[in-house]
Amino acid sequence: MSTPTFSVADIRKTFLDFFAAKGHTVVASSPLVPGNDPTLMFTNSGMVQFKDVFLGTDKRPYVRATSVQTCLRAGGKHNDLENVGYTARHHTFFEMLGNWSFGDYFKRESLKWAWELLTEVYKLPPERLLATVYAEDDEAYDIWTKEIGLPPERVIRIGDNKGGRYKSDNFWMMADTGPCGPCSEIFYDHGEHIAGGPPGSPDEDGDRFIEIWNNVFMQFDMDEQGNVKPLPAPCVDTGMGLERLAAILQHVHSNYEIDLFDALIKAAARETGTSDLTNPSLKVIADHIRATAFLVADGVIPSNEGRGYVQRRIVRRAIRHGYKLGRKTPFFHKLVQDLVQQMGDAYPKIREQQARITDVLRVEEERFFETLAHGMEILDSALAGGAKTLPGDVAFKLHDTYGFPLDLTNDVCRERGVNVDEAGFATAMEHQKSTARAAGKFKMDRALEYTGAANQFTGYEQLAESAKIVALYVDGTSTAALHAGQSGVVVLDRTPFYAESGGQVGDQGTIGAGSACFTVADTQKIKADVYGHHGTLEAGTLNVGDTVQAQVDLQLRAATMRNHSVTHLMHKALREVLGDHVQQKGSLVNAERTRFDFAHNAPLTAAQIREIERLVNAEVLANTDTNARLMDIESAQKTGAMMLFGEKYGETVRVLDIGTSRELCGGTHVRRTGDIGLFKVVAEGGVAAGVRRIEAVTGENALAYLQSLESTVDQAAAALKAPPAELTARIGGALDQIKTLEKELAALKGKLASSQGDELAGQAVDVKGIKVLAARLEGADAKTLRETMDKLKDKLKTAAIVLAAVDGDKVQLAAGVTADSIGRVKAGDLVNFVAAQVGGKGGGKPDMAMAGGTNAAALPQALAAVQGWVGERI
């Protein structure tokens, strides 16, 4: 059987049309930034936008769906960045073809339709295909062998090959618990001339057998013990990589040889002045322009954190590869126009935002080019001596001074067979962070020269203390006196002020004598046992040797103690609820709240948070005494006291018992757990790979938080005219009504535009044998413009048509030319003629093109000129 050649555009359309004919609703691609999953950095599969449906928290007006989803894998768990350009199939950005069943059809239809599409529509040779099933999934195996007719030797059972029950390449789980089930993957055999073995064999990682389609059957619900039970409404989730399928259908072995990439690679070669179209750097650039442009379209701007930093890394990696090819001036942003030509029809948002995308990438490119050449000189110099490892401090300098992301430096070094000292890089990074933290403190701590005796901390028992001034500092320099209006540092021989340590902030308060009043804004350690009180002398004069009264701010200290004590209880509760793997990774305790970072690899569920709150508040209600004891480190260990991994402890430590918690701690705490009053979690999220952060409030702040929530609920109830207890149902009903109205509105717009289209056909003017029509459709969107265009072309037979829609100042344009007329008039030329007059530009195919503009006032004149323009060209 000869396999026909399909373009990427053909593959998309054929896939969607096939499943639409099978009763599936065609759903648009969701943005690369997930709207329903804050735990996920980027959309990395087609099912992401349906996750809430699978979890039962959302219901759609359809039970069958199909989509072509834009995806990104760069950063976090799914990171293909370093492989892009060097393999045949790795991408940062890719498109995923998918179809879904939400409690409707199941394995039989899913597998049979997949086989039908691949062999009867795409015309793939059946003898080139094989499938895998989960070893225990006899149903799928029988469908393949007995109903579809795939020979048993080409249906491979894959068992638990990942070290545990249900841990298998052919058993899919959404998370550690919840919906899961077996999957069946379809592979394409490229032939014996390609190295590699079938799936499940020792040589399965070769390139001969390539997975093209995965059919996931979510039929079970897994509990925390790993037991599964059937779901009441099994679902289907399938995914097929568009680029992989295109390579097969276009008879090439690499994804980078398909038509879409061929065009982008040639564009990259044009902009970099390169003639070798096989150069891996061109593949990198072609891949990265897709990723970065779509990220900008979805609102991700290059920055130094989060998604923005991933965007910056991708942009700068592309720029570096252009630089490697000899391009020493900005070029990358110029590829946006080529990308729009290739993908603008399928994804109108990149055409609509073409100017903005280009501008964002241009600014980032210009910024990096300012330092790129100098950074490369430093890198070249460091590697000139034949060293096999780039020092970590050099890698950090490139990162810190010249904007080289570490993976970019790794990229350069990998090409030269050189390793990067990443541990040294991490050390330099931490040193900079420590320096930055220190610079953010008041200029008073370890930079101050103090040679006197240690001070005595009395703040565990006293909040007011008579003390003597033993040192004063202004602007970091020792002084004998401090005068009114001056800011400085006061050191006392004894102090009730707690100096920042162990995550607890330093105390505030006052130091005074007679008319002199010094307001303490912060307390920091000058040495381990010497505390510096930073602040401002509001009145009078303070001298070294003066006897003063030191008074801690009672309200702030009490609130801070509540939050510190509850942190211990929360730490214990976290370990009880989540497991003993929970370890403290950082904390901040002040008067407003407690912030606690801990090791855990998954978001906390609402039920887990509620259980943590229950456990902690039970300890609060028990109102047990807090007990602190000093003992040697060995004795403390024997008591079972919690010690923080990586923390350095002295020979004598302070063991704190609060409720059922026992930890080593030098902080200040409440006398009884009941003093905490109330505990409420207010936030939970991820801060790094494997690290979560939880924030909570206590006492008056917890009460204020709950009162604020209550006020919000009351306002919402008043707005919806419903009692608070009925809010959830009322909101759900309102959302359902909105969805229904939106659907009805879309249908009405379509009908209105369609009826306008029927009327407009009579307005067409014959120009030298071609019916010419230029008109505005009220209330139409891009989809309606295209649909109306198709109807008018069918009706007018031989025609050149321009349709426009207006939304505020924005103009959307569609141009269409019938097949028998494209030799005389091109839709792209026609749409750009009109677009240029309304402040825009566009493009497309000879028979259909789209454009946008920003000057709606100029539209009537532009449309009026179409007839003359067509007449001149034919």
Swiss-Prot record:
Keywords annotated in UniProt: Aminoacyl-tRNA synthetase, ATP-binding, Cytoplasm, Ligase, Metal-binding, Nucleotide-binding, Protein biosynthesis, RNA-binding, tRNA-binding, Zinc
Annotated cofactor note: Binds 1 zinc ion per subunit.
UniProt keyword tRNA-binding present: yes
Binding of Zn(2+), residues: H564, H568, C665, H669
EC number: 6.1.1.7
An MF annotation (GO) of this entry: aminoacyl-tRNA deacylase activity
Subcellular compartments: Cytoplasm
Catalytic activity: tRNA(Ala) + L-alanine + ATP = L-alanyl-tRNA(Ala) + AMP + diphosphate
GO biological process, alphabetically ordered: alanyl-tRNA aminoacylation; negative regulation of DNA-templated transcription
Entry annotated with the keyword Coiled coil: no
Cofactor(s) listed in the protein's UniProt record: Zn(2+)
Annotated GO CC locations: cytosol
UniProt remark on domains: Consists of three domains; the N-terminal catalytic domain, the editing domain and the C-terminal C-Ala domain. The editing domain removes incorrectly charged amino acids, while the C-Ala domain, along with tRNA(Ala), serves as a bridge to cooperatively bring together the editing and aminoacylation centers thus stimulating deacylation of misacylated tRNAs.
Homology family: Belongs to the class-II aminoacyl-tRNA synthetase family.
Name of the protein in question: Alanine--tRNA ligase
